[in-house]
Amino acid sequence: MDTQSSIGNEEWRIAGTSVVSGMALGKVFFLGTSPLHVRELTLPQEEVEHEIHRYYKALNRSKSDIVALEQEVTGQQGLQEVSSILQAHLEIMKDPLLTEEVVNTIRKDRKNAEYVFSSVMGKIEESLTAVRGMPSVVDRVQDIHDISNRVIGHLCCQHKSSLGESDQNLIIFSEELTPSEVASANSAYIRGFVSLVGAATSHTAIVSRAKSIPYLANISEELWNIAKRYNGKLVLIDGYRGELIFNPKPATLQSCYKKELSVVAHTSQRLVRKSLHPIVSSHAGSDKDVEDLLENFPQTSIGLFRSEFLAVILGRLPTLREQVDLYEKLARFPGDSPSVLRLFDFGEDKPCPGIKNKKERSIRWLLDYSVILEDQLQAIAKASLQGSIKVLIPGVSDVSEIIEVKKKWETIQTRFPKGHKVSWGTMIEFPSAVWMIEEILPECDFLSIGTNDLVQYTLGISRESALPKHLNVTLPPAVIRMIHHVLQAAKQNQVPVSICGEAAGQLSLTPLFIGLGVQELSVAMPVINRLRNHIALLELNSCLEITEALLQAKTCSEVEELLNRNNKITS
C-alpha cells in the first residue's frame, strides 16, 4: 500500500509486535522524545560554588520525584517490581562516589552542572554498553539514561509530559518507554502504548501488563515517522494480531472487538474436558495483593508469591515477625490449593536493600547469606502451623542446591511443633535445570517453569533487548522443546508442573500448554478472567494438533506462522 496516499481520513494499518495483548482505542499522542539540549559553559571562579549548589538542588528534586512515585506504586497490585527498579534509581543517585566525581569536576574544570553530570553519566553508560552478553546490562543502561534525563531535566527546567495528568483516552507513542513512565500512567485514560523498540520480557512490558494496558512495539522507523502525521487522530491497537489501525472504520471496530465480546458470550457454552484444562492461579507480592485477591477471586490460588517484594516495599530485609505474619496469611488463604511461596529471589537486577552482591542470584545468593535463608525457613515453619504451604526454590542450576536447602529445612523444622504439610518445588529457569530434570525431580513435589528467564538464558539475551527479527517470538522452538522435555519427565514421575512468566498469560500459547499437559498457569490478577474465558472456548483435539505442529517447528518464523494461523481458526 502506498503510505503517502493513506494519510488523511482513510483507514491505515501498520504491523508491530504485540508486547502486551489486548484491544485499546484512543487518540494518538506522541510523547516528547527530543534529547535534552546540554550546552558546555565555562564558569567564572566566583560562580563555581553556586553551580554546585544548583546540582545538589536538582539531585534532591530528582530523589523526591522517585520517592513520590515509589510511594504511589507501592500500594498498586502487580507493581512491586517497579518499586524495586525505583529503589535502584535512588541508590544510584545516593552514591557518594557519583556525587563526588560531579562536584570535583565542576570545581576543577569550572564547567556547568548539566554538562558535567551528562558527561559523567555518559561514561557510565558507555562502560555498561561495552559489556555485551551479560544479562540485565540493557536494564542498567536504561536506568542510567532515565536518571540522567531526570536530573538534567531539573537543571534545564525541561521535562517530558506527565502520563498521570491526562483527561482523555490516549494511545501513547514514544520511541523509548521506561518502567517509571508506565507506572505513573493514569490507566483510566492512558489506554495503550506504542514504542519503536520493546521486548515482551522487559520491565516496561511487565509493568504495562500488570496495569492491563496493551502495548505494541518494534515499528519500523519509516512507518513511525509517517505515524507522526496522525497525531491527535483515532487509533486502535489490535494486540491479538499485532496491528495499529489509524482512523478505524466502524466495521473494523466491530470486527476487532468481536473476539473479546464472544469470549464473554460463549463462556458457558463450551468447556474443555474436566481435569484436562489447567488451573489458573495468580501472582502476588505483597499483603495488599493477597487482600485484593481475597476480595476479587477468593477461590483462586496464589500460584507465585514473590517474597522478596516485602523487602523492596520496606526498603530493608523484613524481620522474622514480619515474615511470619505475612506467611501465615498465605497459609490460611482459602484458594483451591495451597499458596506457592517463592524463597527470596535477589541478585542482579533485583538487589537486596542494604546488601551489594551482584555476583550471584536466586538460590545461590541465598546460600551465600545462609542466615537470611535460615530466618526465612523459620518463618515458613511457624506459618505452617496455620496451614499448608508450597515452597518454591528460585534459579536452581544444580540438584545439590535443592538438597542443601532441604537439609537446612530438616534441621530448622525440628525446633517447632509439627505443622501442616510443606511441599517443595523448583523453578526451572536455566537450561542446565532442564537437562538435569531427571535428577531434580526426585527432590520435588512440584515444578514451576519460569519462561522469561528460560528464554533469556537459552537465547543469550537481556530482558530489555528487542529480539532480532528471526527470533522475535515469545517461545522459540528450543524453549518449546525444553518445556516438552520437562513435562514428559515430570509426567513419568507424577510431579505437577505450572507455567509462570509472560507466556502463561499469552492467549495464543494457551492451546500449546493444554496440549503439553500443563496443570497450572500463574498470571497477573487482571489476566485471570480473560484467560479462564479463553480456556473455556478451546477444544482439546485442536490443542493437541497445534501442539504437535509446534513441536516440529524449526524456526521462530514457523512458530509465529502456526500461532497466527491457529489464532485465526479459533477466533
Curated annotation (Swiss-Prot):
Gene3D superfamilies: Phosphoenolpyruvate-binding domains, Phosphohistidine domain, PtsI, HPr-binding domain. Its EC number is 2.7.3.9. It is an enzyme of class 2 (transferase). Mg(2+) binds at E429, D453. Keywords: Cytoplasm, Kinase, Magnesium, Metal-binding, Phosphotransferase system, Sugar transport, Transferase, Transport. The active site is at H203, C500. The keyword Kinase applies. One of its GO terms (biological process) is phosphoenolpyruvate-dependent sugar phosphotransferase system. It holds the Pfam family PEP-utilizers. Phosphoenolpyruvate binds at R306, R342, N452, D453, R463. The keyword Transferase applies. GO terms for cellular component: cytoplasm. Its cofactor is Mg(2+). GO terms for molecular function: kinase activity; metal ion binding; phosphoenolpyruvate-protein phosphotransferase activity. InterPro entries: PEP-util_enz_mobile_dom, PEP-utilizing_PTS_enzyme, PEP_util_AS, PEP_util_C, PEP_util_CS, Phosphohistidine_dom_sf, PTS_EI-like, PTS_EIN. Homodimer. The N-terminal domain contains the HPr binding site, the central domain the pyrophosphate/phosphate carrier histidine, and the C-terminal domain the pyruvate binding site. General (non sugar-specific) component of the phosphoenolpyruvate-dependent sugar phosphotransferase system (sugar PTS). This major carbohydrate active-transport system catalyzes the phosphorylation of incoming sugar substrates concomitantly with their translocation across the cell membrane. Enzyme I transfers the phosphoryl group from phosphoenolpyruvate (PEP) to the phosphoryl carrier protein (HPr). Belongs to the PEP-utilizing enzyme family. This is Phosphoenolpyruvate-protein phosphotransferase. It comes from Chlamydia pneumoniae.
